[in-house]
Amino acid sequence: MKKGFSLPLWVAGAARSALKKLVGLSFENYELIKIPYEKKEIKIEIHSVGLLKNDSHALGITFAKSGLDLDITQNLEIWTIASLEKISFENSLQRVPINIIAGSGVGIKEDTSEICISNFAKEVLYENLLDIIPEGFNLKLEIIFPNGAFLAERTSNQSFGIVDGLSIIGTSAETYSSASPDQLEEAKNNLAKLIQNDFKGEVVFVIGENGLNLLKTHNVNLPIIKIGNWIGPLLVDAAIKKVKTVILFGYHGKLIKLAGGIFHTHNHLADGRIEILVYLAVQENVPFEIIVKLSKLDNIENALLFLEKFNQSTADKLFKRLSNTIEKRSFAYVNRYVKTDMEIASIIFDRKRKIRWAGIYGKKYISYFQ
């Protein structure tokens, strides 16, 4: 399996190189990036660095190597522009002397216009920049992805209220393919560690970075494991390990595949999401002319918007059926391989990161997420 590093490390590498240039330190074609709370450094290659605007700004450039051929950030060009601002009375109370700005191609939250960056990414930047900032100054750091706006069109960012570019939401240093068998083994090992000691029987399987970030804002007091696309085999592994309840938590665009019996959910292997929704609409007795229109839409997000515009009650009934079907099909899938009474609950959030729907079992646990 190819090994690579997440986007925050490459951003930090370019930023550290730019800041060092700005304060007169010599250029090297790599930066050793420290990982928060870990005793290791990772070597990040730097493409180039230079001074701008009468030497008042410095530009650092690198190209991300995620190690994943299908990853949207593989070979992503990253620019960081560093400049220093003398601390004045007005900003003397700023807790962290780093102002991170979303430049061209970097995603922002549509409702607040704030840069979309994970806490892990911020911590990596702080860990690797604070020791270089001269005393009495704040660092202004602008992050630019020259190709970010174009690449963002191939993601579901806009569904989550993220516009104008790619978000910086990595939550760990290393990357691995979510379709790789090695990823499955790592997830199994993580599950084994989670259910040791005082394990109460319930575990949350969260699908994707957006789901993980949302969970962190709700302070869910349950063991949590972020899983990739090997959802089915991990459910079976949980049953073998005598887990009592697995709570599937994710965005409807990913979880809907389980309702259609697709338990390895990488889009390059199988999709069928609109077809599954059409089948569920037939089961829910949605008017035929609406079903025909649904079948012609290009993604689940547009389908939900269309249904809500047609009739909010119908949309909610259909997505509740989706939640119940996810639970039923998942239970049937697991019992093909191991006889178990393990409970499988589904809880689904929408494009606005609002937790909206839950299956029969999911309703028992939804209060944990609110």
UniProtKB/Swiss-Prot annotation:
InterPro entries given in the database record: CbiD, CbiD_sf
One Pfam family of this chain: CbiD
Pathway: Cofactor biosynthesis; adenosylcobalamin biosynthesis; cob(II)yrinate a,c-diamide from sirohydrochlorin (anaerobic route): step 6/10
Single GO molecular function: cobalt-precorrin-5B C1-methyltransferase activity
GO BP terms in the entry: anaerobic cobalamin biosynthetic process; methylation
Catalytic activity: Co-precorrin-5B + S-adenosyl-L-methionine = Co-precorrin-6A + S-adenosyl-L-homocysteine
UniProt-listed Enzyme Commission number(s): 2.1.1.195
Sorted UniProt keywords: Cobalamin biosynthesis, Methyltransferase, S-adenosyl-L-methionine, Transferase
Entry similarity comment: Belongs to the CbiD family.
Stored HAMAP family: CbiD
Protein's UniProt name: Cobalt-precorrin-5B C(1)-methyltransferase
Species of provenance: Prochlorococcus marinus (strain MIT 9215)
Gene of this entry: cbiD
